[in-house]
Amino acid sequence: ESKKYFMYYRCFTREVDYANEDEDSLKRKQTTCVATSNDGITFSRPSLHIYPTKNGDPTNIIHHGPTAHNFVVFHGDLQRTGKRFIAIGGVDGVIPADSGIYLFGSDDGFHFDPLKDSPILTKKHNRDEYHSYFDSMNTVSWDTNREVYWVWLRMNSGVTGYHRRQTQYLQFEDIVNGNPSPLADVMMINATFNHYVSCVSLVASEKSASYFVAIPISFPLYESVLALSRDGITFVNPKEDISAYITDPFVDSRGPPTYEN
């Protein structure tokens, strides 16, 4: 609507002392910054006074605190939430009683306020003793066809091994005041054992029905590949048959394997 691209990314305040900070202190000093663009190629940092410096100078910080660790912004359904922009942020272990995913709303993509004082998801929503880890980049999408919000969460099963990391999903009809559906696993039906789904998003397509895009992560070699789904539940790697989806953009540009995260 605004004909602008918004890019949100995590930062730390300049007061961080990496050598002497404990983990909880670092989490509290994290911030979320924003950059905008008219073409999606060249971005600039807006001068905002939401969180100015100690000298009163503007910054491009739009959020701070533990939930800035994975503050994810998306377009919500305006009629259901009253906000054009919705964001979620997960807290994991900073304050045990507060562990969960919190919901925020904004009219302009810059000024975010909590939509609820309590988290919309906590560890009590998990099926068993192996809880979701709210420190990951959990993602949300509004599904206009099904009229539900999808929430994808990282989860560790009780079996050791990197490949046992998995992604779960649940749905809200009302993400502000409603209750979530039971958690269920997202499946990869043609991937090798050492890939798990990460960073799922719903993409609207003009040529076909909307589809879901995921970027699976592999261990111990950190490589990104492409996975696609029509239902948001079962994903395939489209290497064998790309006609039903789109070409995997990582095949030729991935480069040599790397052990860096």
What function would you assign to each model-found segment?
Residues 1-261:
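Carbohydrate-active catalytic/glycan-binding domains of CAZyme proteins
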